[in-house]
């Protein structure tokens, strides 16, 4: 989860998020290099008295500033496309969960089980227990097994929503009449928080998401009690 005054991304909990963190660092270094180069050129132009008003043509310089940006764009695009295709790949999911967005709560259905579904509402501030997080706790958490590929099918019953869990690198739009899918896999147990990330009305801020990633045996025990 995020902390006050945190300027970086959340700690990665999935392979996809780890790739996104590496891509973020890779791109940020390129941006820094470009920024330093531009600032150096500006400083050099302002601080020197030498001018080249007679220069009308410089083929070498034009070639460099045409090829160099193209190379930089390729260096950014290739890892980006790789991650994009990785996010679309789903290999034999061990579990499928369908989530529907509503104004203003989420409903979940474990499609591999005959009757395992529930609604998930935010717990009001007045009902929070000591240690619980304001605007992030829900009455029913989404319990999932860790270290297994899980497919999420997302849609909406009313307006546009967005099902997002930053530490897992997930953000999928929920669109009425359309079924989108995403894949997730957690490398460690714990509670992972998210929220609706598409403005959907007056209570948009009150649609938290809580994933509880547990070992497989614990998930099987939980699912047996819920059926």
From Swiss-Prot:
Cu cation A1 binds at residues 161, 196, 200, 207. It is found in: Mitochondrion inner membrane. Cu cation A2 binds at residues 196, 198, 200, 204. The keyword rRNA processing does not apply. It comes from the Eukaryota. Binds a dinuclear copper A center per subunit. It catalyses: 4 Fe(II)-[cytochrome c] + O2 + 8 H(+)(in) = 4 Fe(III)-[cytochrome c] + 2 H2O + 4 H(+)(out). Residues 1-14, 88-227 are mitochondrial intermembrane. Mg(2+) binds at residue 198. One of its GO terms (molecular function) is cytochrome-c oxidase activity. The chain crosses the membrane at residues 15-45, 60-87. Signal peptide: none annotated. GO terms for cellular component: mitochondrial inner membrane; respiratory chain complex IV. The keyword Oxidoreductase does not apply. Pfam families: COX2, COX2_TM. CDD domains: CcO_II_C (cd13912). It is a multi-pass membrane protein. Keywords: Copper, Electron transport, Magnesium, Membrane, Metal-binding, Mitochondrion, Mitochondrion inner membrane, Respiratory chain, Translocase, Transmembrane, Transmembrane helix, Transport. Component of the cytochrome c oxidase (complex IV, CIV), a multisubunit enzyme composed of 14 subunits. The complex is composed of a catalytic core of 3 subunits MT-CO1, MT-CO2 and MT-CO3, encoded in the mitochondrial DNA, and 11 supernumerary subunits COX4I, COX5A, COX5B, COX6A, COX6B, COX6C, COX7A, COX7B, COX7C, COX8 and NDUFA4, which are encoded in the nuclear genome. Component of the cytochrome c oxidase, the last enzyme in the mitochondrial electron transport chain which drives oxidative phosphorylation. The respiratory chain contains 3 multisubunit complexes succinate dehydrogenase (complex II, CII), ubiquinol-cytochrome c oxidoreductase (cytochrome b-c1 complex, complex III, CIII) and cytochrome c oxidase (complex IV, CIV), that cooperate to transfer electrons derived from NADH and succinate to molecular oxygen, creating an electrochemical gradient over the inner membrane that drives transmembrane transport and the ATP synthase. Belongs to the cytochrome c oxidase subunit 2 family. This is Cytochrome c oxidase subunit 2. It comes from Tachyoryctes splendens (East African mole rat).
């Amino acid at each position: 989860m995020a902390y006050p005054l945190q300027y970086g991304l959340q700690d990665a909990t999935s392979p996809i998020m780890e790739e996104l963190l590496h891509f973020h660092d890779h791109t940020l270094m390129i941006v820094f290099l470009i920024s330093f180069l531009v600032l150096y050129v500006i400083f050099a132009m302002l601080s020197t008295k030498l001018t080249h008003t007679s220069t009308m043509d410089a083929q070498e310089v034009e070639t460099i500033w045409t090829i160099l940006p193209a190379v930089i764009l390729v260096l950014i695009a290739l890892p980006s496309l790789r991650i994009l295709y990785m996010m679309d790949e789903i290999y034999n999911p061990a579990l499928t969960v369908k989530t529907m967005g509503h104004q203003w709560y989420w409903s979940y259905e474990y499609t591999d089980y005959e009757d395992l579904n529930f609604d998930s509402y935010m717990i009001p501030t007045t009902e929070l227990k000591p240690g619980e997080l304001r605007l992030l706790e829900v009455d029913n958490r989404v319990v999932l097994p860790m270290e297994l590929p899980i497919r999420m099918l997302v849609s909406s019953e009313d307006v546009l929503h967005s099902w997002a869990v930053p530490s897992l690198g997930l953000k999928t739009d929920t669109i009425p009449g359309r079924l989108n899918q995403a894949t997730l896999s957690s490398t460690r147990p714990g509670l992972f928080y998210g929220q609706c990330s598409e403005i959907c009305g007056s209570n948009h801020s009150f649609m938290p998401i809580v994933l509880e990633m547990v070992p497989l045996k614990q998930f099987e025990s939980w699912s047996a009690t819920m059926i």
